[in-house]
Structures are given as structure tokens and as C-alpha cells.
Amino acid sequence: MNQFHTRVCPRLLISLSLLTSLPAAACAKVRVAVCQILVIDGDREGNFRRIEYALQTAGEKHADIATFPESSILGWENPDAHKSAAPIPGPDSDRIAALAKQYGLMIAIGLDEKDGDKLYDSAILVDKHGKLLWKHRKLNVLPELMDPPYAKGDVESINVVDTEFGRIGVVICADTFSDEYANRVASLKPDLMLVPYGWAETVDKWPAHERDLEQLVVSRAKIWKCPVVGTDLVGEMTHGPWTGRTYGGGSVVADGSGNVLAILRDRDTEVRVLDLPIRRAKH
């Protein structure tokens, strides 16, 4: 028995050691603040104040990442943005970068971008040091809602960035309607997707319209196999054929299996902080 023990146990220990050293997905958590803010069309300074108030709350709750809605600076489908939007990098994105550095938070936010004579519905990801990590230009721009419409981005802007929290991607609202774009995201194997939304409908359609957003976020989380944070706003559309439609909040967070982790308030502002499970596999 002793001879068997001395011969077999070392081999067993070596085998166990090899097994435990095999490559495996690393499990971690990231603390995300979902910043469902009020956005008023054209109110750049007021919107920046509301962004900073949300960041203060996120910082107090020790968040790692703060997420914001689509067109958080000037409002979505606002034709005045053709004159007042800034380039990226530029004054607006620089202010976001300064806030990220001030509060020590990574920020994902939607903001309009002027590039020459074109206006883009864009979103940026900025790290806690204020470095611009990525810019995405919306592809599914709904051109019937503004004249002239937003310019369409390139599909190559759908990408992921390696960060301290894993591979993070950003797309915008109606981009998630497209199976083609969703499949491209899936091929990139993200660890976390952050999606600014401008989810608007007529007053009589709320709160039922929240369920549509929930179903959309859940369906994409299942395809992407990672947590998805869909951040909506509160407010009202004031231009174009959808004038008077309400942004009703109801931001949605789902895990990589499509389980709903949070739905934010109906037609009210809220900053909610959640610990999201991130499974960082070998890519």
C-alpha cells in the first residue's frame, strides 16, 4: 500500500496541476452605473450639468463604468445640431474626457458629431484617465426623421476594445434592430456591450413600449453571449415627424444568458449601479 501511494500520488498531483493550469475563462465583475438622465434638446449646458450630477452619484456608489443615452448633449434628431454639434475629438468629447478623469470612471455616451458638412449620431467610450478608446457612428440612422438626416457610419465602426474590464463594444439604439449588425457584434466576442438608446413613443404607448426595449435587449444579449446595458433617457422629442413623442426611460440590463437584471424607472430619471458578471475568455 505504501509503495502504491508513493508511486501513484505524485502522478495524480501532476495531473491535477496540469488540469488547473489549462486556459479557462476568467470570471470577474464590473460595477456599472446606468445613468437614465433627462435630456433637453439644444440645452448643452443643462445636459452637461445633468451628466455630471449622474457621475457624482455613480462615483459615490463606486461604479467602474457610467453609461448614458443616445445624443445626450444636444438631443436626438435635433436639426439645430447641424450648426451646433462639435467634432470628435472636440469640445464636447473633451468635456466628457475631463469628467471621466475627474470622477475616475469609464464613460460610454451618445453625442452628435460634426465632421465637415456631415452630422453623425455617434457614441464614445472614454477610460477613467480621459483617453478616448473608441468612437462608433450609428449605421441605422432613420433618415426620414430629419432633413438633412444623420450621415450613416461605416460597419467597421462596430468593434470591441480591450480594456481593464475585458472586451467592450458600443453600438447605438436602432443598430440593434439589424441582424446583420448584431451578427457582426457576435463575431467579435465581446465581454460587455454598452448601448445608448433614444427609445421614443407616443404617450399612450407607455409603459408598454418599455417591454419592446426589454425584449430587444434580451434578444441581443442571448446572441452576443455577454451582458448588455441599454441606457434610455427621459424627455420629449421636439423636432420632425416624431415631435411630441416621449422618451420614457425603462433602461434595461441583461446578462449573457438573456436574464433581465434591471429595468429602470418608468418616465423618471434614475442612476442605478449594478455589479455585472463578466466572463473574460481567451479570444
PLM segments and residue spans:
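Short beta-strand segments enriched in small/hydrophobic residues
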Residues: 29-39
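Hydrophobic residues at beta-strand termini and immediately following loops
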Residues: 35, 84, 136, 161, ...
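Cys-nucleophile CN-hydrolase/nitrilase-fold catalytic domain and related Cys-dependent amidase chemistry
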Residues: 44, 49, 53-129, 135, ...
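N-terminal secretory signal peptides that target proteins for export/translocation
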Residues: 1-7
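Boundary at the C-terminal end of the N-terminal hydrophobic targeting segment
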Residues: 24-28
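Active-site catalytic loop in hydrolytic enzyme cores
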Residues: 98, 114-192, 196-197, 202-219, ...
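CN hydrolase (nitrilase-like) catalytic-core segments centered on the catalytic cysteine
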Residues: 88-108, 177-271
